[in-house]
């Protein structure tokens, strides 16, 4: 048997080829075994995988291999989230077609992923940019449209005047386009929307059923949906100041208890009343236009200076018609939340306080903290938003906030005002539930996306593309010679005959948001060969939901929430029979690395520097010049700070198994892992150690472990092996991979001693117990280090592939300890512990207790009055 070092560069490609040739990881839709669907969020084909990919996909692979060994029919597919702006940028910069760029990147990344030894079913591979995929996405768009889940409407968007395209809120940085740097404008555009808001309450309440999701993610979605209960209050406008035909403004508030602290009413710049007043007020018109020159992102609005324009209108307080409140147009009020109008209570809302301090409107506290003197309680620069009792609020004084809210609601529900459009009176207020969640605008002015299957006809209006004509394919002869949407400029593609009247018409030139592509790919994986429908109902309902979904927490809201909505929309249109796509969700931590900075402030890559010394004496220099380099903070790996490690370099030097092992071993999987060369080298030493143990033992081992027995000689090793197996199994099932690896590290120590023991060559029972322990070790490391495990399995003469071997069974008998430690009390107080045989008779236990130093000291040579032994619980010595 060879004892040469394990050579990953030779071993790993060999086993990868064998797995491919045998189709080991193919999943069958007609398999009778219980299914287990494990999925990692599929990647964007940027051209290179990074260490975050290595960590993410290794975790999923461990779960897949473990579940396969446990007897499940495992579905573990891979695909490509392939549409998106980077491909268009590459086309503009490199004069390359987005499709060519994308598919070249897919080929490169697929090769890299295969080098990791992932147990993927590549037969199910999909790319969202392929017409065979987006054909079905277009079909579902039409189904959603027919079901009333899609609508076309005007919407405020962030418009980049240089790139001539809509920007997502996340693409607006300090008021400028992320790519062009141009000042972003607000524009009113006609957009296509998915009506996710119809599912607000359902999406919210169903979060309680997702008990295998991180609580943090559920809370983030809950806050994003933003359910709020409040009052819709009608403020009558002072007739002397109001435009003709305007008599009131409606305000939604979650704090009706603070009405007596009101100092102003504020309208959104997009409120119809603001527009009406602006017709006769050029200065207000200019102010509204200035508001529109800023982005629509909530974060930008929250951090911007609070600006307002006094319209001259005055609103009457709901409880006091003589109390007139100034009506402003304010840049921080959003039209798409509530009614687009608020009343401001500055003492108890920081945004309102900043506003009144700027415009000198003052504030009146109406909630006083418990224990504070109401007479001396004042607000200056910091609003009070805590609990307390009502003050300065007339009939509400002394009430709790909750009681005050209810009292206000009851009073205003019974009070009335004339209806704005005539026809008698109506209540001043009514209870209402609002949601922060807005409909999902999916229109993008991009080429490289899924075409929206709609035709615009002057005679017939909006006409769906007939299903028989799907897919609507993107044209190949496209030019990226200037900004904007190339589909708008295409000479022929957008011109088409109307399917209804045959007249001249044009195609919809917007494409779908790429989040649509990733909102159903998990369902397509269940039967990607179905050419006639997005899903095969029998198959998708059997294989879904995904049992374990793995990805970054940065997708907690958009992707995961959109997927939950999309699944419900698919159910409503008959494509699936379930509501939730992901039964279990795990969000892994990032891969981080030190940063290094040159004297000129530029970043240095880890491959360019040499680090010497330890602790405070640790320092870095450039390899080429010897110039000193500043060792900076540990941060997420990023190209901009050049603190990245190329997975190809690590796999080429140490092998995929070393990279996988290190990624799993160094920290809990939900926390960041700090990349270190020392840690990788330590992982590689363990690879070599396992290989050495197998090679040393293999020539002396029997074919099986039948002769191991449970003698006093062999039981300790066997018990250690079975205890390790139980612990590793539990850790993997809980996704505590670092804990599993720690148990395996600990197990190798006694296993090494057992192999070095002379009895290996002389005692058949001993050799059989070593055989069992090694077999178990190899099968336990197989999910983490599959190539090494296959090589060791072969060296041990194992049957078939370890990738197809069953997970070992724990013998519960071997988990029972032979000894037990009992507390020893003297006159009811614990003084010592005694370790005895688990089934030792009382006289033996009593003798062991009397031999303890603590008992001897207490007795001082005397005989105890009695010794009480509670079997396997406690011993009490009565002196």
From Swiss-Prot:
Main EC class the enzyme belongs to: ligase
Signal peptide region: none
UniProt-listed Enzyme Commission number(s): 6.1.1.4
GO CC aspect terms: cytosol
Record-listed ATP binding positions: 639
UniProt GO molecular function: aminoacyl-tRNA deacylase activity; ATP binding; leucine-tRNA ligase activity
Predominant location: cytoplasm
UniProt motif ('KMSKS' region) ranges: 636-640
Similarity remark: Belongs to the class-I aminoacyl-tRNA synthetase family.
One Pfam family named in its UniProt record: tRNA-synt_1g
Protein name as it appears in the record: Leucine--tRNA ligase
Localization per Swiss-Prot or TrEMBL: Cytoplasm
Species the sequence originates in: Afipia carboxidovorans (strain ATCC 49405 / DSM 1227 / KCTC 32145 / OM5)
HAMAP family named among the record's database cross-references: Leu_tRNA_synth_B
InterPro entries referenced in this protein's UniProt entry, alphabetically: aa-tRNA-synth_I_CS, aa-tRNA-synth_Ia, Leu-tRNA-ligase, Leu_tRNA-synth_edit, M/V/L/I-tRNA-synth_anticd-bd, Methionyl/Leucyl_tRNA_Synth, Rossmann-like_a/b/a_fold, tRNAsynth_Ia_anticodon-bd
Organism lineage: Bacteria, Pseudomonadati, Pseudomonadota, Alphaproteobacteria, Hyphomicrobiales
Motif ('HIGH' region): 43-53
Recorded name of the encoding gene: leuS
One BP annotation, GO: leucyl-tRNA aminoacylation
């Amino acid at each position: 048997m060879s004892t040469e070092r394990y050579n990953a560069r030779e071993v790993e490609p060999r086993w990868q080829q064998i797995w491919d040739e045998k189709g080991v990881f193919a999943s069958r839709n007609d398999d009778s075994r219980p299914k287990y669907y494990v999925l990692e969020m599929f990647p964007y084909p940027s051209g290179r995988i990074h260490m975050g990919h290595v960590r993410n996909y290794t975790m999923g692979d461990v779960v897949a291999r473990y579940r396969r060994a446990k007897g499940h029919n495992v579905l573990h597919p891979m695909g490509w989230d392939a549409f998106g702006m980077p491909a268009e940028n590459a086309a503009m910069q490199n004069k390359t077609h987005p499709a060519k760029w994308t598919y070249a990147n897919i080929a490169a990344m697929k090769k890299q992923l295969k080098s990791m030894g992932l147990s993927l079913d590549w037969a199910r591979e999909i790319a969202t940019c392929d017409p065979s995929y987006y054909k079905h996405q277009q079909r579902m768009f039409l189904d959603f449209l027919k079901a009333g889940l899609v609508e076309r409407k005007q919407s405020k968007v962030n418009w980049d005047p240089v790139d001539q395209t809509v920007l997502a809120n996340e693409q607006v940085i300090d008021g400028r386009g992320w790519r062009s740097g141009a000042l972003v404008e607000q524009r009113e555009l006609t957009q296509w929307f998915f009506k996710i808001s119809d599912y607000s309450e359902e999406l919210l309440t169903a979060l309680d059923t997702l008990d295998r999701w991180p609580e943090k993610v559920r809370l983030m979605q809950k806050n994003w949906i933003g359910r709020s209960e409040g009052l819709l209050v009608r403020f009558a406008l002072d007739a002397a100041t109001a435009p003709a035909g305007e008599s009131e403004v409606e305000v939604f508030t979650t704090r009706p208890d603070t009405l007596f602290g009101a100092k102003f009413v504020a309208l959104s710049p997009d409120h119809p009343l603001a527009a009406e007043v602006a017709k006769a007020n050029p200065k207000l018109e200019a102010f509204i236009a200035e508001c529109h020159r800023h982005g629509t992102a909530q974060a930008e609005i929250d951090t911007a200076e609070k600006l307002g324009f006094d319209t001259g209108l005055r609103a009457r307080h709901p409880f006091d018609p003589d109390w007139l409140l100034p009506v402003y147009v304010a840049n921080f009020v959003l039209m798409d939340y509530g009614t687009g109008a608020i009343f401001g209570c500055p003492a108890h809302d920081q945004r309102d306080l900043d506003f009144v301090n700027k415009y000198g409107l003052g504030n009146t506290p109406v909630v006083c903290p418990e224990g504070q003197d109401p007479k001396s309680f004042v607000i200056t620069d910091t609003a009070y938003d805590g609990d307390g009792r009502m003050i300065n609020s007339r009939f509400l004084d002394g009430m709790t906030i909750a009681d005050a809210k209810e009292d206000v609601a009851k009073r205003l529900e019974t009070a009335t005002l004339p209806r704005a459009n005539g026809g008698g009176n109506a209540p001043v207020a009514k209870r209402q539930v609002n949601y922060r969640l807005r409909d999902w605008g999916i229109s993008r002015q991009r080429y490289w996306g899924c075409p929206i299957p709609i035709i615009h006809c002057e005679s017939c209006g909006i006409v769906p593309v007939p299903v028989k004509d799907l897919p609507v394919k993107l044209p190949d002869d496209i030019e990226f010679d200037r900004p904007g949407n190339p589909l708008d400029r295409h000479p022929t593609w957008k011109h088409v005959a109307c399917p209804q009247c045959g007249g001249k018409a044009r195609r919809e030139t917007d494409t779908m948001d790429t989040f649509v592509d990733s909102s159903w790919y998990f369902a397509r994986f269940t039967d990607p060969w179905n050419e006639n429908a997005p899903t095969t109902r029998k198959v998708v309902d059997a294989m879904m939901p995904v049992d374990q979904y793995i990805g970054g927490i940065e997708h907690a809201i958009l992707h995961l929430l959109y997927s939950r909505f999309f699944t419900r929309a698919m159910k409503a249109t008959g494509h699936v029979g379930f509501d939730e796509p992901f039964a279990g969700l795990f969000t892994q931590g990032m891969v981080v690395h030190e940063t290094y900075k040159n004297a000129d402030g530029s970043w240095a890559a880890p491959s360019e520097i040499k680090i010497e010394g330890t602790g405070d004496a640790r320092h870095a220099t450039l390899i080429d010049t010897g110039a000193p380099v500043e060792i900076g903070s540990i941060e997420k790996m990023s190209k901009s700070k050049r603190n990245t490690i190329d997975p190809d370099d690590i796999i080429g030097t140490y092998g995929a198994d070393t990279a996988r092992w290190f990624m799993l071993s160094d920290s809990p999987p939900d926390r960041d892992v700090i990349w270190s060369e020392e840690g990788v080298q330590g992982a590689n030493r363990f690879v070599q150690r396992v290989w050495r143990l197998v090679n040393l033992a293999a020539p002396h081992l029997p074919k099986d472990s039948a002769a191991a027995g449970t003698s006093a000689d062999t039981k300790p090793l066997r018990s250690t092996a079975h205890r390790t197996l139980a612990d590793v199994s539990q850790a993997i099932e809980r996704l505590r991979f670092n804990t599993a690896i720690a148990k395996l590290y600990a197990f190798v120590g006694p296993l090494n001693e057992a192999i070095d023991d002379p009895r290996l060559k002389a005692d058949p029972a001993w050799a059989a117990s070593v055989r069992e322990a090694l077999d178990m070790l190899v099968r336990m490391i197989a999910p983490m280090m599959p190539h090494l495990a296959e090589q060791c399995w072969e060296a041990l003469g194992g049957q078939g592939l370890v990738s197809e071997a069953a997970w070992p069974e724990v013998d519960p008998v071997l988990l029972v300890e032979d000894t037990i430690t009992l507390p020893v009390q003297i006159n009811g107080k614990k003084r010592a512990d005694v370790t005895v045989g688990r089934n030792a008779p009382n006289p033996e236990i009593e003798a062991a207790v009397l031999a303890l130093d603590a008992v001897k000291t207490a007795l001082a040579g005397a005989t105890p009055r009695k010794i009480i032994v509670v079997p396997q619980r406690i011993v009490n010595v009565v002196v």
